[in-house]
């Protein structure tokens, strides 16, 4: 059983998945920092010096200045500023993944076009498209050259 697990764990797909998860986690941290430390402060500055992470609605009757004070008092709050940060975070990650997948698909399509086998050739006599394996043109009935042998036009 240990041998089977070792074979499974060392397969290319599992290793690729592991690398993807690690890189995805690191990328998520970078995007979260970008959102929390750069984007939302800039948006907040444009909207009147508002820090999104501090925006909340207090559902208890007691006033609190910060979310931390409300949490310490175990008060019920709706932390919509933190939710907005999470939404912005999600949009950036989703857009980044969209761009990466779009590029991968573009490269894959280009590679498929380059690798597509040639299935037709041009008849040298009537210039029509014919199958590569044809020995006689179905349009002008000319005999065609085959590997190493030149056949005359009838």
From Swiss-Prot:
Membrane topology: Multi-pass membrane protein
Subunit-level organization: Homopentamer.
Entry's Gene Ontology molecular function annotations: mechanosensitive monoatomic ion channel activity
InterPro entries xrefs: Mechanosensitive_channel_CS, MS_channel, MSC/AndL, MscL_channel
Protein name, as recorded: Large-conductance mechanosensitive channel
Localization: Cell membrane
Pfam families: MscL
UniProt KW keywords: Cell membrane, Ion channel, Ion transport, Membrane, Transmembrane, Transmembrane helix, Transport
Record carries keyword Transmembrane: yes
